[in-house]
Swiss-Prot record:
Its EC number is 4.2.1.20. The beta subunit is responsible for the synthesis of L-tryptophan from indole and L-serine. It is an enzyme of class 4 (lyase). InterPro entries: Trp_synth_b_CS (IPR006653), Trp_synth_beta (IPR006654), Trp_synth_beta/beta-like (IPR023026), TrpB-like_PALP (IPR001926), TrpB-like_PALP_sf (IPR036052). The gene is trpB. It catalyses: (1S,2R)-1-C-(indol-3-yl)glycerol 3-phosphate + L-serine = D-glyceraldehyde 3-phosphate + L-tryptophan + H2O. This is Tryptophan synthase beta chain.
Length: 410
């Protein structure tokens, strides 16, 4: 594998589902047969022209791909340095990148004869995407969501229920994404016969990290084509926010072997990366461990217990990160930084005022880092950030943070 990696950063995972020291398949004996069946089905689908024909048709006519590549002219002028482009994946059907992956997994689930789909969700976007595709195909849908996230993402909870999904509030732990994923895994163990677990990020046991990455890679593939058409070359830097890391991996992966393209992932810095762990910056402030079926960087205490972390963004409020990101971090191919809640809120407001785009709090973190670095870069430097979600779901959270009074969602 070392020789392969010398030539390419795109060959992982290996036959054991590992990216260097990260990844793998740490699951119960009950789940192992289903995991192996899923791996076999996906390996077959990857070379099946009919599978990709169905995917491409749905991406085009149901999701609305390709999503636009947008030159943020006023933001660029305001920052006074690099040219800033936005990959507008918030314009997808359901308002985020999540549906890119959900379509692929549910097509696989149907091929496997599964009739019940379960999912975890934090910001609610993966839950909405899963409920949407289940409604389209007539499948039962159950979404696990932390009770704290149910409160701060009320619009998406209502959307999921409108789409026919059962939303299960999870009260264990701090009631966030980690806890929702724990309960979804418990459900899967007891309902393996008819149930498919549609994971929303590039985490979990192999083959999920690679499979989700491959479905999301449509983002970066489109950017390669679109940026070449717009500028005659690839961007100098690509930037994306990271919770588990699926939108980022989707943008990054097609550029991994283009050494001239800088790659920056932006983690949730919460109240600041400090010993109190009031953040969700696993790479910046964590260390390796095992969670949800894979080895990766995690927020842990001295005894190895998983900590809760904190972020204003429900979609970034996860104490781990996808194993491929952990590997890219360790080998130095990608740089990972953190942005605080305050910085993300500033970027949120600036994007609204200058570009007429209301971003989700997740990509607001990436945009905040763009605002930090763009002024010091030359005017011919091209940055492409992934606008991975729209901000409708976050207006109540932002209003509260900024001190505005709003009526309760009804």
């Amino acid at each position: 594998m070392a020789n392969d990696l010398f030539n390419s950063f795109m060959t992982g995972p290996d036959e054991n589902g590992r990216f260097g020291d990260f990844g793998g398949r740490f699951v119960s004996e009950t789940l192992m047969p289903l995991i192996l069946e899923l791996e076999e089905q996906y390996e077959n689908a990857k070379t099946d022209e009919s599978f990709w024909a169905e995917m491409n048709d749905l991406w085009t006519h149901y999701v609305g791909r390709p999503s636009p590549l947008y030159f943020a002219e006023r933001l660029t002028d305001h920052l006074g340095g690099a040219k800033v482009y936005m990959k507008r994946d918030e314009l997808n059907h359901t308002g985020a990148h999540k549906i890119n992956n959900v379509l692929g997994q549910i097509i696989l689930a149907r091929r496997m004869g599964k009739t019940r789909i379960i999912a975890e969700t934090g910001a609610g976007q993966h839950g909405v995407a899963t409920a949407t595709v289940c409604a389209k195909f007539g499948l039962k849908c159950v979404v696990y969501m932390g009770a704290h996230d149910v409160e701060r993402q009320a619009p998406n909870v209502f959307r999921m229920r409108l789409l026919g999904a059962e939303v299960v509030p999870v009260t264990s732990g701090r009631g966030t994404l980690k806890d929702a994923m724990n309960d979804a895994l418990r459900d899967w163990v007891t309902n393996v016969r008819d149930t498919f677990y549609c994971i929303g990020t590039v985490a979990g046991p192999h083959p999920y990290p690679a499979m989700v990455r491959d479905f999301q890679a449509i983002i970066g593939k489109e950017v390669r084509t679109q940026m070449t058409a717009a500028e005659g070359r690839f961007p100098d830097t690509v930037i994306a926010a990271i919770g588990g890391g699926s939108n980022a991996m989707g943008l990054f992966y097609p550029f991994l072997d283009d050494k001239e393209v800088g790659i920056i992932g932006v983690e949730a810095g919460g109240k600041g990366v400090n010993a109190k762990m009031e953040h969700c910056a696993s790479l910046t402030g964590g260390r390796p461990g095992v969670l949800h079926g894979n080895r990766t960087y995690l927020l842990q205490d001295d005894d190895g217990q998983i900590l809760e972390g904190f972020s204003i963004s429900a979609g970034l409020d996860y104490p781990g990160i996808g194993p491929e990101h952990a590997w890219l971090h360790d080998i130095g191919r990608a740089q990972y930084v953190s942005i605080t809640d305050v910085e993300a809120l500033e970027a949120f407001q600036l994007c609204c005022e200058l570009e007429g785009i209301i971003p989700a709090l997740e990509p607001s973190h990436a945009l905040a880092h763009v605002m930090k670095i763009a002024p010091d870069l030359p005017s011919d430097h091209i940055i492409c950030m992934n606008m991975c979600g729209r901000g409708d779901k976050d207006i109540f959270t932002v209003a509260k943070a900024l001190g505005f009074e709003m009526g309760e969602f009804a």
